[in-house]
Amino acid sequence: MINQVYQLVAPRQFEVTYNNVDIYSDYVIVRPLYMSICAADQRYYTGSRDENVLSQKLPMSLIHEGVGEVVFDSKGVFNKGTKVVMVPNTPTEKDDVIAENYLKSSYFRSSGHDGFMQDFVLLNHDRAVPLPDDIDLSIISYTELVTVSLHAIRRFEKKSISNKNTFGIWGDGNLGYITAILLRKLYPESKIYVFGKTDYKLSHFSFVDDVFFINKIPEGLTFDHAFECVGGRGSQSAINQMIDYISPEGSIALLGVSEFPVEVNTRLVLEKGLTLIGSSRSGSKDFQDVVDLYIQYPDIVDKLALLKGQEFEIATINDLTEAFEADLSTSWGKTVLKWIM
């Protein structure tokens, strides 16, 4: 079977390429239905990654957030028509200590390997997680970002002290919003504070205990642990504010990605006995755990709906370009692609 793959060949330039797919291979064949654009995709699209990185990784199909429908499974594990969320991280070995998303041998779709912008995606069976029938697929398209947050929370739980009465979240964007949703469900008795700089973004966090502007933090405010969801150049000031306000022996979970090294007040980290926990991407278990949370707490999906921005029907390469360009001017939420190529 001929498969069409839509690749970024140069900044702002998509082209279609073709490969031959063996439908009787060991993979399950999934037709993408809805996808969502990530900031990492935009760094490739706009050419803002390092030139050496771009030359090594392009041409490449973008997008690592998406849901689809099983069209064929020669192994019979999935029924035709089963809706699944697609897992972008693909391990090539198993390690009893190191998680799959930290193994150097693992590869990640839309980061040196083709992403989900294809007519058909071939997945290992454990890279497809079944979804409930009655769920809104357009909202669930950005589940991968939810798994990144849950993975960070699970890592934090293993490495932090038992005091978990108060949490601070730095970042009023998509990742901060998702992290707040999950912490509210997982720690219903704890207080959650969100720190940001944009009023209309902070207004979405109606379910937390309080929100603060980063330049108007009350004197004497403190919390047990913190989650950094800022990234970019702003992560430096965010991390150092967390260090200033966090209680002794607290943990700071770092989720934001910065293209540049940041300076950290290590003197205060040592003085307070703080733990900094790095976290990146997620694995298939995180996806299954998130889907289980959707089923257990349907209101999580309702809250995630507030993140849905523009939805574009993608039938041509011009539609793709239009969607990526529009997403660049989106200050809140996720751009969704309805895949009808």
UniProtKB/Swiss-Prot annotation:
Q: Would you say which domain of life the source belongs to?
A: Bacteria
Q: What does this protein do?
A: Catalyzes the NADPH dependent reduction of D-ribulose 5-phosphate to D-ribitol 5-phosphate.
Family to which this protein belongs: Belongs to the zinc-containing alcohol dehydrogenase family.
Q: Does the keyword Cell wall biogenesis/degradation apply?
A: yes
Catalyzes what?
Answer: D-ribitol 5-phosphate + NADP(+) = D-ribulose 5-phosphate + NADPH + H(+)
* Organism in which the protein naturally occurs: Staphylococcus aureus (strain NCTC 8325 / PS 47)
Q: Pfam families, per this entry?
A: ADH_N (PF08240), ADH_zinc_N (PF00107)
This entry's Enzyme Commission designation comes to 1.1.1.405
Positions bound to Zn(2+): C38, H64, E65, E144
Q: Which SUPFAM superfamilies match?
A: GroES-like, NAD(P)-binding Rossmann-fold domains
Q: What is this protein called?
A: Ribulose-5-phosphate reductase 1
Single GO MF descriptor: zinc ion binding
